[in-house]
């Protein structure tokens, strides 16, 4: 068996085309464009790449992107003051603060400072809590993107056993909640999980997000499983995932590549969240 490749690039293109169409319909009615404020603190090269990708997507689909590039020595109070100003700016529907932040800034405090209806990253405890209570509004972009990729396979997820490798706040935990919402039986594994290979071998769906290259071995994969690789690791100038790709591809029914899998979907779902926040904002005016 050789797995079908789930192209995040292709699915993201469809999502963004649909968003662009909806924005054009609003602007044709003399409505303003959606607005997204993107805040970058410092000059971390990876963060710059991610931020530029988000700004480029905004330009492509008709979202007004407002850039705030701040020096690495920016203080917490200064950043919080900018967020407070954006919270009250009616031309801004979404606020994104690129993580990680410099050590002098408390990321939790910053995340919680963004009003929940402008939290297009889906990190605010209010939005995470709504997902846990089965009433999601703005959803965490990477897990939301993974669900769109799973949807694109046409496989009915209800009743399948999903194993999430990694329990981070950004991927693992909200990912488990998304899969639970889709009717999966979910196992979350983490750094203290015993016999990880066994747990992975029982999975109909494996979602790997630990940030360790080739961490999930191909031999662990159950024949016919769906493998979603969230990891992006740079090794000897190449981008590789958390899953041992070639060996896993030989056993899986569907698999995402790295690059070109989950990455493009994270940005696409950020755009989707911004559109959603904009639509709510328009209804409230």
Swiss-Prot record:
* Database matches in PANTHER family: C-1-TETRAHYDROFOLATE SYNTHASE, CYTOPLASMIC, C-1-TETRAHYDROFOLATE SYNTHASE, CYTOPLASMIC-RELATED
Q: How does it assemble?
A: Homodimer.
A biological-process GO annotation: L-histidine biosynthetic process
Pfam family of the protein (one):
THF_DHG_CYH_C
What is the phylogenetic placement of the source species in the record?
A: Bacteria, Pseudomonadati, Pseudomonadota, Gammaproteobacteria, Pasteurellales
PROSITE patterns associated with the record: THF_DHG_CYH_1, THF_DHG_CYH_2
Keyword check for Secreted:
no
Name the record gives this protein: Bifunctional protein FolD
The entry marks the following residues as binding NADP(+), namely 166-168, 191, 232
- Highest taxon of source: Bacteria
One molecular function GO term is:
methylenetetrahydrofolate dehydrogenase (NADP+) activity
Relate the protein's function as given in its record.
Catalyzes the oxidation of 5,10-methylenetetrahydrofolate to 5,10-methenyltetrahydrofolate and then the hydrolysis of 5,10-methenyltetrahydrofolate to 10-formyltetrahydrofolate.
């Amino acid at each position: 068996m050789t797995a079908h490749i789930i192209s995040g690039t292709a699915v993201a293109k469809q999502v963004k085309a649909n968003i662009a169409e909806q924005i054009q319909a609003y602007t044709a009615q003399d409505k303003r464009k959606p607005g997204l404020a993107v805040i970058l603190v410092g000059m971390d090269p990876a963060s710059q790449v991610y931020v530029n990708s988000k700004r480029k997507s905004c330009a492509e689909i008709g979202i007004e992107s407002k850039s705030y590039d701040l020096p690495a020595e920016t203080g917490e109070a200064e950043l919080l003051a900018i967020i407070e100003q954006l919270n009250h700016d009616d031309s801004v529907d979404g606020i994104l603060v690129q993580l990680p932040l410099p050590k002098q800034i408390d990321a939790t405090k910053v995340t919680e400072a963004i009003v929940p209806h402008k939290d297009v990253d889906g990190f605010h405890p209010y939005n995470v809590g709504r997902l846990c209570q089965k009433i999601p509004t703005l959803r965490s972009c990477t897990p939301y993107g993974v669900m769109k990729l799973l949807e694109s396979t046409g496989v009915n997820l209800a009743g399948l056993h999903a194993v999430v490798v990694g329990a981070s706040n950004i991927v693992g935990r909200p990912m488990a909640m998304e899969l639970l919402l889709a009717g999966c039986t979910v196992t979350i594994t983490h750094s203290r999980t015993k016999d990880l290979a066994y747990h992975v071998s029982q999975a109909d769906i494996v979602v790997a997000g630990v940030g360790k290259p080739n961490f999930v071995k191909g031999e662990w994969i159950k024949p016919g499983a769906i493998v979603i690789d969230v990891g992006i690791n740079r090794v000897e100038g190449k981008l590789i995932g958390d899953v041992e790709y070639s060996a896993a591809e030989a056993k899986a029914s569907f698999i995402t590549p790295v690059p070109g899998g989950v990455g493009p979907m994270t940005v696409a779902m950020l755009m989707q969240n911004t559109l959603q926040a904009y639509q709510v904002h328009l209804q409230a005016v």
